[in-house]
Regions:
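Preference for protein termini
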Residues: 1-469
């Protein structure tokens, strides 16, 4: 059983952890009214900058501010180095799995992953079978979601290999903290993160075999929940932000419409799902994609980052096999552990899940954003019974895990400061080399007792510091 109750700032006896001592002294010496004023300034600055997300399912389609908490999540550098190595190891194995899956399928023949687990997965793309990619990289940009147990051990909760979001909030949170509290950064060595856009652009350029490829960011448009991030990253990289209608394919090559005439496009950082990329190949009703894009991609005339078909590797039903992938492809022991997982597609595991629903977290294998899940200890009897019937009807569509009490971090709440549950999403870039910007996005569940940190479910964010020991 995974233990729970780890606080990022305080030891079990209430003493401040060494890497938080400088911040704790500053917090104790700073008047409450000044802290409140700075928090109000942060809200105003975020609003002026347009740092919002769209809440799907909201009747008004409301754009909302991402709540930002000014107490940072701090990680000692020695601890971070382990996390960094673990994330790099994991993403390397996942890329090797994708290259293998779409070619020789050695891992299936070795009996490590059942064929039906991946080949019948709706995220598996037959169009990618046998297609060679530059450097054999499928997932150029990845987000690895981490949580901690009671003794501070990191566990990977899930991998995000399709269109991981949140990095713009990571960067804006840091800008905000440096603007509002410059004295904190002068008092200790905090690893910088402002070079991420340059690393991202270098990663995208290196995805092409060309010496000087042209890069664009493809967005579904301003009504997408992450549109702020799409525009932010395009601006920071100095590349064009385009929608599907801005691009066209001629002679199996992709061009961008400009006032000076067509301009060739070599690399597309796409922020829309596979199904909407090309109405000729996938969803014929898509108005967001580019007709003929798949043909151009298969001809090697354009690079897509991330590649089509990466979703099969971050599907929740494939998650339990990632540690086996690391051993199989890298011949290494996993640095970061998986959360124990029961697959409802297996009859014996299904029986265990159905018998223990009040104690488990159950997730749809295709779910995301905190939707399509049951948190047993927080659910009513009626909700548990309804979920039991859904699982029985489609057992292959669900996995279950023990309920984790995510680590907590002191957070400003209405009545002062209180612990709130957090997770961490480091961003991993795979190009000529695999790199991770120090820290990542810390998400915080602002509702007391809540374990759901997603912004779509009322979660907020914190700046993440990697502090020299």
């Amino acid at each position: 059983m995974i233990r729970t109750g780890f606080d990022e700032m305080y030891e079990a006896d209430g003493q401040v952890r060494p890497h938080y001592r400088a911040f704790a002294r500053w917090l104790a010496e700073t008047p409450d009214e000044l802290l409140a004023q700075r928090r109000r300034e942060a809200d105003l600055l975020f609003h002026r900058a347009g740092i919002t997300f769209t809440l799907y399912g909201d009747e008004q389609g409301t754009e909302r501010l991402i709540p930002f908490d000014t107490i940072p999540r701090s990680i000692p550098a020695s601890e971070w180095r382990v996390v960094e190595r673990g994330c790099i190891q994991r993403v390397k194995a996942l890329n090797m799995f994708l290259a293998d899956l779409y070619h020789e399928q050695r891992i299936i023949r070795a009996g490590i992953i059942p064929a039906e687990q991946v080949l019948a997965n709706e995220q598996y793309q037959l169009a990618m079978q046998g297609l060679d990619l530059h450097r054999d990289i499928y997932a150029h940009i990845c987000g690895v979601d981490l949580v901690r147990d009671g003794d501070g051990t990191y566990y990977v909760l899930e991998d995000n290999l399709r269109t991981p979001s949140g990095v713009s909030y990571m960067l804006e949170d840091r800008k905000m903290m440096m603007r509002l509290f410059p004295e904190l950064f002068a008092a200790q060595r905090i690893a910088p993160i402002d070079h991420y856009p340059n690393l991202l652009l270098d990663t995208l350029r290196s995805a092409s075999p060309l010496d000087d490829p042209s890069v664009v960011v493809l967005t579904p448009g301003r009504f997408n929940s992450a549109f702020f991030e799409h525009a932010f990253l395009a601006r920071e990289m100095g590349v064009e932000l385009v929608e599907g209608a801005d691009l066209f394919v001629r002679d199996d090559k992709v061009f961008m419409r400009t006032t000076d005439g067509p301009k060739a496009v070599d690399v597309i950082y796409r922020r829309l799902d596979d199904a909407f990329l090309d109405p000729l190949a996938f969803n014929p009703d898509s108005m967001l994609g580019v007709p003929g894009l798949l043909s151009s991609y298969r001809s090697g005339n354009v690079v897509l980052a991330n590649a089509i078909g990466t979703g099969v590797a971050d599907d929740k039903s494939v998650y339990p096999f990632v540690t086996d992938m690391i051993k199989f492809y890298l011949d290494e022991e996993p640095i970061l552990k998986n959360v124990p997982t029961w697959q409802c597609r297996n009859p014996a595991e299904l029986s265990h899940v159905l018998a223990n629903l009040p104690d488990l977290v159950v997730k749809e294998t295709q779910g995301s954003g905190g939707y399509g899940m049951l948190v047993g200890p927080a659910a009513t009897t009626a909700q548990i019974d309804a979920f039991r019937e859904r699982i029985k009807a489609k057992p292959h569509a669900y996995i279950a895990q023990p309920t984790l009490s995510l680590s907590t971090c002191p957070t400003f709440v209405e009545n002062g400061i209180a612990p709130r549950h957090i997770d961490l999403r480091p961003f991993v870039l795979s190009g000529r080399e695999t790199r991770v910007v120090p820290g990542g996005l810390t998400r915080v569940a602002l509702r007391e007792g809540s374990l759901v940190v997603n912004s779509s479910q009322g979660g907020g964010t914190k700046d993440t510091w990697v502090v020299e020991d």
